[in-house]
């Protein structure tokens, strides 16, 4: 019961954010649609224009090509204010640009708690889904993520407890009585006795539906735990029972939020090296985007065609990672 409220919020928001891209385009055509005609300006040039308009901002995510008729959505991170030694408060972390004209279509704070508008409602639900918008406390931003991860662990354990409680009791030996088979005694747990009392029908619905959907419930619970507590619990546990290849992020400590790692190599240099490496691996897709994580000092270059950034079956496209200081392949 304690977990039910969390699961209701997570389930309802999860159903909505499954369509986040489609809903965002429906609600915000003024941001996502581009009307100017003509050849597209190179994305890196557009990124430089954004930084020139606001020197407090650093472009940390650059889509390298736009879908026809769509704007380009750049990810933004704040630079450090030399006067305070802390990050600037920009009030936005996304900028939408018409790729043909270079005109800025708008800015927004993805995941903002307030105000909730058509521009922010989808991202509000997205963050609510996995962190409940729990604020930063004692310099840590992950309290909400950890809380939902703990709820997922409880749910995972509850899946096994509930399954065990449906199993038939072990019968005491009775030499003169022929016992029913184990399956025949468990079979009623999978059925709903419609002729019983309201309490019995409700109990049967709860038990039967839980059994028929048990595998799905377990998968959702286990994956939620593994996503929210990946580095804290899941990866260390899996490393004990199997060989797990660490990601570049697993091998580094996260820098202090207000002391980001400044990149030394540039976007063009990293893209050039990544394209060479991708061709050596036999990848045919073009470089689709580049991002820089200033908390870890790592560049990532994804390879996909425009509009295919979710990859096959939603698992995402392949990425190559490079060190932000010396540009070496990670």
Identify the role of each PLM range.
Residues 1-330:
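Conserved histidines in hydrophobic membrane contexts and catalytic metal-binding motifs
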């Amino acid at each position: 019961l304690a977990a039910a409220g969390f699961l209701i919020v997570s389930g309802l928001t999860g159903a909505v954010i499954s369509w986040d891209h489609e809903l965002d385009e429906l609600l915000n055509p003024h941001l996502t649609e581009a009307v100017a005609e003509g050849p597209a300006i190179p994305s890196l040039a557009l990124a430089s224009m954004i930084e020139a308009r606001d020197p407090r901002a650093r472009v940390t995510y650059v889509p390298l090509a736009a879908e026809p008729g769509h704007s380009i959505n750049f990810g933004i991170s704040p630079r450090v204010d030399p006067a305070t030694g802390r990050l600037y408060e920009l009030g936005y972390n996304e900028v939408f640009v018409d790729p043909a004209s270079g005109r800025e279509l708008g800015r927004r704070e993805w995941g903002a708690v307030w105000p909730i508008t058509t521009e922010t409602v989808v991202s509000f639900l997205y963050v609510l889904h996995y962190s409940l918008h729990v604020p930063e406390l004692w310099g840590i931003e992950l309290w909400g993520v950890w809380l939902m991860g703990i709820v997922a662990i409880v749910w995972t354990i509850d899946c096994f407890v509930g399954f065990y409680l449906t199993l038939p009791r072990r019968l005491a030996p009775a030499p003169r009585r022929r016992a029913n088979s184990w399956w025949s005694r468990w079979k009623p747990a999978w059925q709903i006795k419609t002729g019983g009392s309201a309490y019995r029908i409700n109990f049967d619905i709860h038990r039967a539906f839980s059994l028929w959907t048990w595998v799905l419930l377990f998968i959702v619970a286990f994956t939620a735990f593994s996503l929210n507590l990946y580095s804290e619990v899941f990866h260390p546990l899996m490393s004990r029972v199997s060989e797990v290849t660490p990601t570049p992020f697993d091998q580094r400590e996260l820098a202090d939020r207000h002391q980001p790692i400044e990149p030394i190599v540039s976007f063009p240099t990293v893209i050039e090296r990544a394209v060479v490496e991708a061709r050596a691996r036999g990848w045919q897709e073009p470089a689709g985007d580049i991002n820089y994580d200033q908390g870890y000092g790592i560049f990532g270059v994804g390879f996909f065609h425009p509009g295919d950034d979710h990859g096959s079956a939603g698992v995402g496209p392949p990425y190559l990672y490079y060190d932000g200081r010396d540009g070496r392949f990670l």
